[in-house]
A protein has these predicted regions:
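C-terminal accessory/binding modules appended to enzymatic or scaffolding proteins
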Residues: 88-98, 102-107, 178-179, 184-187
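Predominant activation on well-ordered alpha-helical scaffold segments within soluble catalytic domains
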Residues: 24, 28, 96, 100, ...
């Protein structure tokens, strides 16, 4: 059978473009590779490409990298690592990886992506919002602003500008992303702490009938909150503007309630203040806009505190609103299973309340759910699919779940799911909090599961019951031999909770357990845990 000759590469580069024939051939081959490389064609090496395009690398563009060089496991992808350390590890890497390093590394989904995908979207300019990383806050948005500038003429700007192809906006079904929320109905809340607790934690129930949403255990639930009315009124008073001032087709009060963030004051607000004031106040506002801290109070300046810091200004309400960040949704781990609670979703939420300079501050969504919502209220919501946080495909596999505080949320869902499907695998839960008499979340449920044998083991840690603080990682070390035995039986390990301390300490404890009871060196133990991660047998949902 005769074979037809291989067709040439299609022409992506117009003949009028300022390239030599060799350069045009190479670029056409490059784009052919991007859009589907023809069978049997070997791409040029970076060295050969540099010979064809000698001016490209000389003009400051980063050299091409192999897939292995571009994706080296992201050593900065550690939520406990400070920003300067992450950026140092990413130094010299391609710009998208440095953008990734600037993020909070939690893969929490509040931005609508995981960290790597958000960075990639910023790099290709299909996403232009630099303030979506809620846990990273102003520190992340400032660093992203610096890095994003490189796309438009900085050190990593391309030497040759090629017209951008119009970006396609990915469609997401209703309720499947922050950009396309649906409505669900608030049903109830129940306090999980007993009287005398220093914490305020709520079990929240939401009806999904109107939304038509479903979810899997391990997923998270996004909610668009509203700012506290007292805070909104305080801002209106400090601004000296009427609440019914028109902002587009809404009022100023409405926009302040659910349209903009009144939490940490953004740099743009201080920049606006610097434009309309003078003298020392202008200098301070300009310094704050540049990320400096002239009076040592920058960390405590929410929008109302910023207005109080510069009293007497009469800002145009529209300009004021333009200077604020949009109010972001908040994402919570789902603590229920549709198989045991059809048509409903439950959340486990710590209400955040604290005082700064004799004024109460409130967690915008936690106190919205934990105090201001009433049964029947309609909420804008969406399901955030899990990024590699799910039960084993084999229900016979044992699972070890480590979730102190609200970190218990996904594991309550796991337990209900495994109970509903009659999974034969063993279940071991580590839970901890401050005091056993006040902070034992879901005590009756867990006690019943333990009595029935569904919860094979329940290990508890209380940090305030004795003089010595006991945390889950301490309990892990006490039963390290048994953990090692479960691992040898194929157990999957899950961690949920605080990224800065707990998750790091738990991983350290697990490495030590492997070294001690597995009879290996610390380096080998680290490799063992890394292998668990690579195989999906060690998964974390941290915040």
């Amino acid at each position: 059978m005769s074979m037809s000759p291989r067709p040439p590469f299609p022409s992506f580069i117009p003949e009028s473009a300022p390239f030599t024939p060799e350069q045009r051939t190479w670029l056409n081959g490059l784009f052919a590779g991007v859009f589907g490389l023809q069978e049997g064609v070997t791409p040029l090496s970076p060295a050969d490409a540099a010979k064809l395009l000698p001016g490209l690398l000389d003009a400051g563009a980063a050299p091409a990298t192999t897939p292995t060089e571009a994706d080296d496991g992201a050593p900065w992808h550690d939520p406990a690592m400070p920003m300067p350390d992450r950026m140092k590890l990413a130094d010299g890497r391609p710009l998208p990886r440095r953008m990734m390093a600037a993020m909070a590394q939690q893969d929490c989904g509040q931005c609508g992506y995981n960290c790597k995908d958000y960075a990639d979207k910023l790099f290709d300019k299909s996403e232009k919002r630099l303030n979506l990383c809620v846990p990273g806050g102003k520190e992340t948005s400032r660093m992203l602003k610096q890095l994003y500038a490189e796309l438009d003429g900085g050190a990593s700007a391309p030497a040759v500008e090629i017209a951008e192809e119009p970006k396609r906006v990915a469609y997401s079904p209703p309720g499947r992303s922050r950009d396309n929320p649906v409505y669900a109905t608030f049903l109830s809340r129940q306090r999980l702490n007993k009287e005398g607790s220093e914490k305020e934690t709520w079990h929240i129930e939401i009806d999904l009938a109107e939304s038509g949403l479903d979810y899997e255990v391990g997923d998270s639930f996004g909610i668009f909150p509203a700012n506290a009315p007292s805070l909104v009124e305080g801002v209106l008073e400090a601004l000296g503007a009427p609440g019914d001032f028109p902002i587009g087709d809404r009022t100023l009060r409405e926009v302040l309630t659910d349209g903009v963030s009144l939490s940490p004051a953004p740099d743009m607000l201080f920049q606006l203040v610097s434009y309309i004031t003078g003298g020392e106040r202008k200098a301070k506002a300009k310094a704050l806009a540049e990320g400096k801290d002239p009076d040592g109070d920058a960390a405590s300046l929410d929008v109302l505190a910023a207005l109080h810091k510069f009293p007497g200004l009469r800002m145009d309400p529209e300009a004021f609103i333009e200077a604020l960040d949009p109010l972001q949704p908040r994402v919570y781990s789902i603590s229920s299973s549709l198989k045991s609670s059809p048509g409903r979703v439950t959340l486990t939420v710590d209400a955040v309340r604290y005082e700064v300079d004799k004024r109460m501050r409130y967690g915008v969504c936690s106190t919205f759910l934990g105090g201001r919502c009433s049964p029947g209220d309609r909420l804008r919501v969406y399901v955030q699919k899990a990024h590699g946080f799910a039960l084993p495909a084999d229900p016979a596999k044992p699972v070890i779940m480590i979730g102190p505080g609200t970190g218990i949320a996904p594991f309550r869902a796991f337990l209900h799911e495994r109970q509903a499907i009659k999974a034969p695998g063993r279940n071991w839960l580590f839970f901890g909090h401050q005091r056993s008499n006040h902070d034992f979340f879901y005590e009756e449920e867990l006690t019943a599961m333990r009595a029935s044998g569904h919860l094979t083991r329940l290990t508890l840690a209380w940090s305030r019951d004795a003089n010595e603080k006991i945390y889950v990682q301490h309990r892990m070390r006490e039963v390290g031999r048994d953990i090692w035995a479960w691992l040898n039986d194929g157990a999957h390990v899950y961690v949920c909770g605080d990224a800065q301390r707990m998750a790091k300490d738990v991983e350290t404890a697990l490495v030590d357990i492997v070294a001690q009871h597995g009879g290996c060196t610390p380096a080998q133990a680290k490799d063992f845990v890394a292998d668990l991660k690579a195989k999906g047998r060690y998964q974390a949902d941290v915040y």
